[in-house]
Amino acid sequence: MGKYFGTDGVRGEANVELTPELAFKLGRFGGYVLSQHETERPRVFVARDTRISGEMLEAALIAGLLSVGIEVYKLGVLATPGVSYLVRTEKASAGVMISASHNPALDNGIKFFGSDGFKLADEQELEIEALLDAKKDLLPRPSAEGLGALVDYPEGLRKYERFLVTTGADLDGLKIALDTANGAASVSARNVFLDLNADITVIGENPNGLNINDGIGSTHPEKLQELMTETASDIGLAFDGDSDRLIAVDENGAIVDGDKIMFIIGKYLSEKGLLAKNTIVTTVMSNLGFHKALDSCGIHKKVTAVGDRYVVEEMRQFGYNLGGEQSGHVIIMDYNTTGDGQLTAVQLTKIMKETGKTLSELASEVTIYPQKLVNIRVDNSMKERAMEVPAIAEVIAQMEGEMAGNGRILVRPSGTEPLLRVMAEAPSNEEVDYYVDTIAAVVRAEIGLD
């Protein structure tokens, strides 16, 4: 991660950290870096979610893009994966999404996509950061016909919706509850599932700029669970603010997280011979029960660091077509280049329809182990070297020995804070408490600051 770019673009409190001035510079410098080798006038697609700060940042970002001669196609409110899809299929030079995903309304972010629909490589982000930190802006300043033009492009939303529908099945007879988080999915999810002939009920469909992700959506599925009870729906589908995540709820009101969703889709593809290298890519946070379920089906897995960015890198490098995270980011590379909540929802409901199974039946093969995570404040200089402390290494080895393969321990540094995270999974809550508390006590005694 660089000075400005984190693992998912540039983020911060809108108008405080992520200011219009910074958005203008990101548009100007980012647009230049991504289009400097174009032989024709470059085109960049820009979209946003429903945050109140979105239009402010959109205006500033677009001004920056126009100032270096880029033609900007303004998509308005659209899901992040919709930008990725349109950039790739319409052969644009780049795409930009203004969103802070599942974060609250006061935050916002700016995320770039290259012409291939993938997030930027580290080298491209560093090139943009170098221009941001330069003492003087030496980029060209065209005038008159050299300036970029702005094109309103509402057709982009319709094209993305039609794409989603083409990947699905006729859902006649399936009753679906949707939670669009008062975010980007609020303009599209209803249309997609109506076009698929589903019987739908929708909440979180009335954004006011401030209520995105506010007690609703994939990080707060409680309201969707209540709606499932009220409507006796077959499945509930909850998206986050920019609709790159999906969390589902089964007909009994139980949460079906990213691990279970990946398993359901992966098993379906594997049985059809369509799972590339019969492998799913996941992160170190995926539950041990997910791994055991894959083993029982003969499906292989590759494990990366936390973050859908690293999952996608692994998939691209080795040619896998399914990966994701426990949090609900699911990447189905046969269709799109980034996590896509609505695409995942369409595939999940298609599998229900084709198999005739309920969501609880499809998810029942994954037994989620109890999990506990404790954050311990440590000095930044020590969080990367904790495993070098003999007492810490010894207690972890001791706990792993007691588990005898029927559990998992993960001790890792936070990527953004002076914290060491201690996580364990085991068959019972009592065992999890024992493993985590024992390790945490040693960590606090050796390097803890509290």
UniProtKB/Swiss-Prot annotation:
Free-text cofactor note: Binds 1 Mg(2+) ion per subunit.
GO term, biological process aspect, one: carbohydrate metabolic process
Modified residue annotations for Phosphoserine: 101
Enzyme active site: 101 (phosphoserine intermediate)
A Pfam family recorded for this sequence: PGM_PMM_IV
Record-listed E.C. numbers: 5.4.2.10
Modifications the protein undergoes after translation, according to the UniProt entry: Activated by phosphorylation.
Stored InterPro entries: A-D-PHexomutase_a/b/a-I, A-D-PHexomutase_a/b/a-I/II/III, A-D-PHexomutase_a/b/a-II, A-D-PHexomutase_a/b/a-III, A-D-PHexomutase_C, A-D-PHexomutase_C_sf, A-D-PHexomutase_CS, Alpha-D-phosphohexomutase_SF
Cofactor: Mg(2+)
Binding residue positions for Mg(2+): 101, 240, 242, 244
Tagged with keyword Metal-binding: yes
Catalytic activity: alpha-D-glucosamine 1-phosphate = D-glucosamine 6-phosphate
GO molecular-function terms, A-Z: magnesium ion binding; phosphoglucosamine mutase activity; phosphomannomutase activity
GO cellular component: cytosol
Keywords: Isomerase, Magnesium, Metal-binding, Phosphoprotein
Function: Catalyzes the conversion of glucosamine-6-phosphate to glucosamine-1-phosphate.
Sequence similarity: Belongs to the phosphohexose mutase family.
Protein name: Phosphoglucosamine mutase
Originating organism: Streptococcus equi subsp. zooepidemicus (strain H70)
